[in-house]
Structure formats: structure tokens, C-alpha cells
């Protein structure tokens, strides 16, 4: 039987400016942020959360992403794609049961369509928005990453089915956290022998967002962004959860990375 574990992995980095991550801060200073993704192993089948950058940007960033590379430049080695990293841990991509998407921005879609037996779980509002984003958000969605034939999708419906229990045993719970993107969701991971871990993903890029010291440099709704952080703070306190923010280079350094794991 497979143990229930959480692996924290990284799909390269993004080079940008401080103000791209922390609104109106940094005076134009350069900033480099990690691109995390996660693997949950489970006897019922494994889950990949997000998958990071698409492997195509390792060889042709501008060809795959286009003009957004002028703002966010991906740094990714050819062996840092999510499939290769999961294989390197000794897991078969065919055993991945779920690919769960926090949202569909370009640095979170690296797993879509790359695991042959996976059901892809996403908020319906996010999926629909990704095909017809507003002008200011269009560069963040790379349609060829998620508009692929033959994919099996499972759609969640915001507050209607909030706190969805993916496995039915409490291991992985979704939390609807719109704001950064219209259909963003965060996750609570419960493990047999560790404190719960709250994966904010991009609901809180950094601890500055979490502590309400800064707004993120990109968001779809300021009000929703702020209220989603408040929701997560309450939820984290209720569950005594360790908070894992989305792209904080300082905080991310403090967590165990694969091949180490949380169990």
C-alpha cells in the first residue's frame, strides 16, 4: 500500500520585478521567485497539484509564452518538468489519478494532459474565464496548455461545493479563494503524522500578502483577493495549519523539498 505523503517540488523560477509580486513596491528592483508544485501520494492514486511551468519553456520560452516573457522570464532546466521530476522520485505517471488546478495561469499548468489516467479538477469559473480572459489578464493564460483534446475534466462550482474533499478521507480539501484569478482555489492537506498544511497557492504569493502588508502585483479583483486571504487566515487558525504561500523565495526555502517529504 502506498503511504500518504506530500512532496514539495519546484519547476524552476520566474525572473520579474518586485512590483510584479508586491504591488507598488521595490522601486523597479529585480526579483526571482520559485514556481512550486506538489505531489500527494495516496493508496487510491496520486495527485499532482498544478505542475508548475510547462516543460516547453525550458527550450523556447518566448515561443511558448509570447510577450508575457517581457514581464516574467521562466528559468527552467530540461529535466525540471513535472513528469520527469515525478518519475525521478520513482512514481509512474500512469498512477496519477488527479491533476488538481489552483487556477490556469501559465506557471501552474505544467501537468495538464501529461498524465494519461488523470482527471483534471478545476473551478468551472476559472476554466471558462481562461478561454475568454479580460484584456489585462490575457497574457497569463496560455490556451495550448489547457485546451487539449481528450482530457477528462471535473468542474467545481465555487461556494456551492466549497471545501470539496478530493479523496473522501480528508487528505485533500479544496478552498475557493477567488481574487488573484476568478476561479482560484487553495488547498488543505492533512497527513497521518504531520500538522495540516495550507497551500495558499496564489491567493497569497508571499507572507507580505498573508500578513496584509501588500497586495499582489497581479489580481483580477482586489476585494476578492483581500477577502480570500481573510478566509484562509481563519481556516488556518481553525485547523492549526502550517501555511505555504505561493511564490515567496524566503518562506519557500524553509520547507522540505523532494525527495524529502511530509507524511
Swiss-Prot record:
Report the cofactors.
Zn(2+)
Protein family membership: Belongs to the metallo-beta-lactamase superfamily.
Is the keyword Metal-binding in the record?
yes
Q: What is this protein called?
A: N-acyl homoserine lactonase AttM
User: What highest taxon heads this organism's lineage?
Assistant: Bacteria
Keywords, A to Z, come to: Hydrolase, Metal-binding, Plasmid, Zinc
The GO terms this record gives for MF are:
acyl-L-homoserine-lactone lactonohydrolase activity; metal ion binding
The protein's annotated catalytic reaction(s) are: an N-acyl-L-homoserine lactone + H2O = an N-acyl-L-homoserine + H(+)
* Positions with a binding annotation for Zn(2+) 2: 107-108, 202, 247
**Is Zinc a UniProt keyword of this protein?**
yes
Q: Which residues cross the membrane?
A: none
Q: For this protein, what does the record note about how its cofactor is bound?
A: Binds 2 Zn(2+) ions per subunit.
Question: Its Enzyme Commission number?
Answer: 3.1.1.81
Record: residues binding Zn(2+) 1: 103, 105, 180, 202
Classification via InterPro entries = AHLLactAttM, MBL_superfamily_lactonases, Metallo-B-lactamas, RibonucZ/Hydroxyglut_hydro
Amino acid at each position: 500500500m502506498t503511504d500518504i505523503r506530500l512532496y514539495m517540488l519546484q519547476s524552476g523560477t520566474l525572473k520579474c520585478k518586485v512590483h510584479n509580486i508586491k504591488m507598488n513596491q521595490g522601486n523597479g528592483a529585480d526579483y526571482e521567485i520559485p514556481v512550486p508544485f506538489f505531489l500527494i501520494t495516496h493508496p487510491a492514486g496520486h495527485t499532482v497539484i498544478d505542475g508548475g511551468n510547462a516543460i516547453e519553456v525550458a527550450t523556447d520560452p518566448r515561443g511558448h509564452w509570447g510577450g508575457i516573457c517581457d514581464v516574467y522570464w521562466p528559468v527552467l532546466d530540461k529535466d525540471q518538468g513535472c513528469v520527469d521530476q515525478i518519475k525521478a522520485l520513482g512514481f509512474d505517471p500512469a498512477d496519477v489519478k488527479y491533476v488538481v488546478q489552483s487556477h490556469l495561469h501559465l506557471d501552474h499548468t505544467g501537468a495538464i494532459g501529461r498524465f494519461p489516467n488523470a482527471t483534471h479538477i478545476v473551478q468551472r469559473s476559472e476554466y471558462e474565464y481562461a478561454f475568454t480572459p479580460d484584456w489585462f489578464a490575457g497574457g497569463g493564460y496560455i490556451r495550448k496548455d489547457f485546451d487539449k483534446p481528450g482530457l477528462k475534466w471535473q468542474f467545481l462550482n465555487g461556494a456551492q461545493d466549497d471545501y470539496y474533499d478530493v479523496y473522501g478521507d480528508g487528505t485533500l480539501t479544496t478552498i475557493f479563494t477567488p481574487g488573484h484569478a476568478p476561479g482560484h482555489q487553495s488547498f488543505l492537506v492533512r497527513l497521518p503524522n504531520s500538522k495540516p498544511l495550507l497551500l495558499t497557492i496564489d491567493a497569497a504569493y508571499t507572507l507580505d500578502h498573508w500578513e496584509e502588508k501588500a497586495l499582489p502585483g497581479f489580481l483580477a479583483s482586489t476585494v476578492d483577493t483581500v477577502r480570500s486571504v481573510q478566509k484562509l487566515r481563519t481556516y488556518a487558525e481553525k485547523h492549526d495549519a502550517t501555511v505555504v504561500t505561493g511564490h515567496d523565495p524566503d518562506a519557500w526555502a524553509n520547507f522540505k523539498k523532494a525527495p524529502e517529504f511530509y507524511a
